[in-house]
Amino acid sequence: MVAQSTKYDHLFSNLIPNSIDGIKIFGMDDDYIKPQIYDDVTNLENRIWSELYQNLELLLNQYASREYLLGLKTLPIPNNMFPNFKEISPLIENATGWTLLPVAGFLDEELFFDINKKRQFPVTDIIRRSPRFDEKYSEMEIQNKKGYTPEPDIFHDVQAHVPFLMNADYAEFIWKVGVLGDEIIKDKRMLGPDLISHNLKRLQNFAWWTYEYGLVKNNGTSDRFRRVPNDIDYEIYGAGIISSLDEVNNVVDCAKERSPNSKFLPYDIEEMALTCFDYTHIQDRYYIVESMDGLYDSFKKNKELFFFEGQ
């Protein structure tokens, strides 16, 4: 695990101490690989999956991005039972070269980026509000609601993230994020531990405000893939929103001005990298990128932002 330093935290806004505190984290030295034993999935777990999926199905069809809708359509992700990793992984590999890696839970930065640069995407087969989830967190408190949990469960990993891996441009983008994270950690520029920690926080913030909680401008061209036209100005591409009924409803309510809970801000990669996040609550802001191509291009042109050398 990368040593944590607060030396440059004064550069951040919205600073949240221990932003992922309270989640079990696995590292290189842990037994982090945990194959899915599909025959062990219980009827209760299938029912939980089904309820989560069906609660979100119509909302996501109306408000999720085109990349998500097309990816979901091509994968065997059922709405009434757990998905089988062995059925999904070969299809993704054939499409974009990525594979699924079954893991025990949340991974630390070093392990996550090492896996990512190999085009492996970590997935778990534990699900919120299940006995296995309760057992994992029997000795520590964690939010465990149907609408939201900070633990990356199978619903978040597979239902929300995995469909995007069928899109070649998106898959290349998150691979480049992984490569950059690995480069920061290996510190070939010899910046030292304080700046490694700081630059990783910048990259984590960027990832949070984009592929976890990002929105893209709705230009109307995705409606042909929907049952009901999107009636707000944005499409959802952040997996943290997609897997959370509470978060999706918040986006829609705020976009329709039924709630003042969150604000919509224009995409600004420097501001995003320097703005910390709070995983324990519904997000108070969402950044809007003009297009997915704009996101990819911005990241490509601004990598030096993640190699801050101190001041």
Q: Which sequence ranges carry the predicted segments?
A:
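The feature captures two recurrent sequence modes
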Residues: 1-169, 284-311
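C-terminal structured domains
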Residues: 2, 6, 10, 227-228, ...
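Non-catalytic, well-ordered alpha-helical scaffold segments
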Residues: 86, 171, 175, 201-208
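Surface-exposed beta-strand edges and their flanking turn/coil or helix-capping segments
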Residues: 115, 170-173, 188, 192, ...
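Extended, Lys/Arg-enriched charged tracts that mediate electrostatic binding to polyanionic substrates
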Residues: 180-238
